[in-house]
Structure formats: C-alpha cells, structure tokens
C-alpha cells in the first residue's frame, strides 16, 4: 500500500493512481477503471462538482490506508487530499475532495458509509461529507461600519463563494441600502436601554437567525457582544472579524490601544465566536505595517483593508470545509 506522509501532506496524482490500482480494482466503476489503466484523467475545468469528506480522530497507524481503501471501494477520483497529525495532542485530521461523478452511489449513501467507517476507527472520530453543489446558507450580522459587508457581498454576488445569504441583521438601519441593492432581506433590530433592552434585542435576533437555519453566522463588524447562551447555541458556526492581531488588544477600540502602545504593525483576526470574548479558535490573521507618523485614524484606515481580506479568507476556508478545530487550535487545509 502507498501511504503519504501524515504531516501536512498532499497526495499527488501519481500516488493516487498507485493507491487505487492496489485497492480492489474490481469494485471500481468501469469508466474510472478504464481511465486508470489507460493513464487517463477526467476532463476538468477547476470547478468540478465535488464531495468533500473530512475526518478528525485520535491518531494511530493505518488510518490513511483505511481512507485510501474506502475511497477506492466507492470509486472516488481524488482531486485533493490533505492530512495533518499533531504529535502533541495525538490527533489526526484529513480533508478529501473527490469528483462527484466518479462515486458509484448517491450522496446520502456515501455520507452514511463515510460516517460508518469513522465510527469503526474510533468512538471519538468526527466525520462529515458535504456536496459542493449545495450552497451553504449564511446570515450576516453588521452594525454601522459596512466595509466588510460591502466586500463580502461583492464576492458572493460574483459567484466567488459557495454561500447563499439568507438575510442581513443589524442594530442600525445604515446598511439597509446594501441589502436592498443585492435583494437580501434586512432586519433592523434596535437595542433598547440597559441590559434588559439588550437582552430583548438579542432574543429577537436569535429568533431571526435560527428561523433561517444557517450553516454559518458571520459577524461582519457587528459591534455587540453576543450573550453566552447564543455563543453556545451557535458554537462552531459563528465567526467574527476582530480588528486587531489577537491575542493583542482584545475588546473595544483596539486601534486606540495600538496607537498608545506605539506598535509598528496593526492586524486583524478571523476567529470562531465563544463566550470568552475575542478568544475563540483563530481561523486567519494578517498584518499591515504602520509608523510613528500614523495617527489612530490612519491605523483605522489601513486596518480596514486587512479586516476585509482576513474575513474573506477565513469565511472561504470555512465554507469549503477546510477548517477543523481541536483543543482550541485550528487546522486549516490550504486552498
């Protein structure tokens, strides 16, 4: 059996073909076996309909071999294969993308068998299968600053993201023209005075969001702190853009904090939302140089560019099932 390196490896086409030839050729669909023995590849455009299979579990010898055998048995033509084994936690991660037309069964059956295989690997294994033909459903929360919202909506409008925006929710009316331009429902939920007013507003927001059954909730500069119960309810599918290079300058006015400290870099962080403010697992970060001559306003202006880019990357990786979390750390399989 051919086994690629476990740490951060990607299986090349030659290795993939070798693995498939070693594994139960009689079970492969005739069209795929014909291409393999004749050294042919399917015609591809780069936007193929794919099934994405992910798995994370305690590491042990033989997992990659079991995955290879499984994919060969179902006729899966591998388009991407990535692995990571964390030597500290002893945890294994993988993401496999296969050509949907090569699989000799329905999507539901493939999903059932993949989960069954994961359960055989161990009771602590987490597995899922997604179909790239099915757009993920998202809800965007925003306040008065619209630069991240404008950027995301432009990318989605041009078909760059596998995401359908169900609605936009805000505690201000300012971004409604953006929603109207793209034909997206806009829910303005004003926050009343005091903690009771805030709690009532969040209850309304929660009802709106949950009614849409979103795969992802994006806080695109939503300048309100989610209550702990919503953080727990939306755990693992709510992502935020914070305007600093975390863990530096958590909380409010990070650019003001950065200016007072005389930093030479400002940054942004895309992370999962948890009840621990600005301390969720980090998905993506980037920085921009600043100098002693930059004012706080200059830092804010430069930071906006980084915020847009970092959120765009982090959201894309989430939508493409490239993000896995274990022990507060993320594994990001490259695009």
Residue ranges and their predicted role:
Residues 36-136:
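A conserved regulatory-domain signal marking ACT and ACT-like small-molecule sensing domains
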Residues 180, 184-212:
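Adenosine-nucleotide cofactor-binding segment
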Residues 163-174:
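Short internal beta-strands
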Residues 171-172, 182, 196-200, 215-334:
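Donor/substrate-binding cores of folate-linked one-carbon enzymes
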Residues 17-18, 23:
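Cysteine-centered motifs
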Residues 146-157:
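Histidine-anchored nucleotide/phosphate-binding helix
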Residues 1-16:
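Single conserved hydrophobic/aromatic residue that forms the stacking wall/gate
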């Amino acid at each position: 059996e051919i086994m690629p390196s476990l740490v951060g490896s990607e299986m090349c086409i030659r290795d993939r073909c070798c693995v498939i030839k070693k594994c139960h050729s009689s079970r492969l669909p005739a069209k795929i076996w014909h291409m393999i023995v004749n050294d042919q590849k399917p015609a591809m455009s780069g936007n193929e309909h794919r099934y994405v299979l992910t798995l994370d579990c305690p590491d042990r010898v033989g997992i990659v071999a079991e995955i290879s055998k499984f994919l060969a048995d179902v006729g899966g033509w591998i388009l991407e294969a990535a692995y990571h084994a964390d030597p500290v936690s002893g945890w294994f991660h993988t993401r496999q993308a296969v050509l949907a037309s090569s699989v000799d069964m329905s999507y539901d059956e493939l999903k059932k068998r993949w989960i069954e295989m994961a359960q055989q690997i161990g009771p602590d294994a987490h597995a899922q299968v997604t179909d790239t033909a099915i757009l993920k459903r998202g809800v965007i929360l925003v306040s008065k600053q619209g630069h991240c919202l404008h950027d995301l909506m432009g990318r989605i409008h041009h078909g760059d993201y596998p995401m359908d925006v169900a609605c936009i929710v805000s505690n201000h009316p300012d971004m409604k023209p953006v929603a109207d331009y793209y034909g997206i429902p806009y829910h303005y939920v004003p926050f009343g005075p005091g903690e009771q007013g805030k709690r009532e507003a969040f209850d309304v927001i929660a009802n709106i969001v949950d009614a849409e059954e979103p795969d992802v909730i994006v806080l695109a500069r939503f300048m309100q702190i989610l209550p702990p119960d919503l953080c727990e309810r939306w755990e693992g599918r709510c992502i935020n853009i914070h305007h600093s290079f975390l863990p530096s300058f958590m909380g409010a006015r990070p650019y003001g904090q950065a200016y007072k400290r005389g930093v030479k870099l400002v940054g942004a962080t895309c992370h999962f939302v948890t009840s621990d403010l600005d301390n969720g697992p980090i998905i993506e970060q980037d920085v921009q140089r600043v100098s002693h001559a930059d004012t706080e306003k200059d830092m804010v202006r430069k930071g906006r560019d980084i915020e847009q880019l970092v959120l765009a990357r982090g959201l894309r990786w989430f939508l493409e099932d490239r993000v896995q979390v274990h022990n507060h750390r993320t594994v990001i399989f490259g695009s």
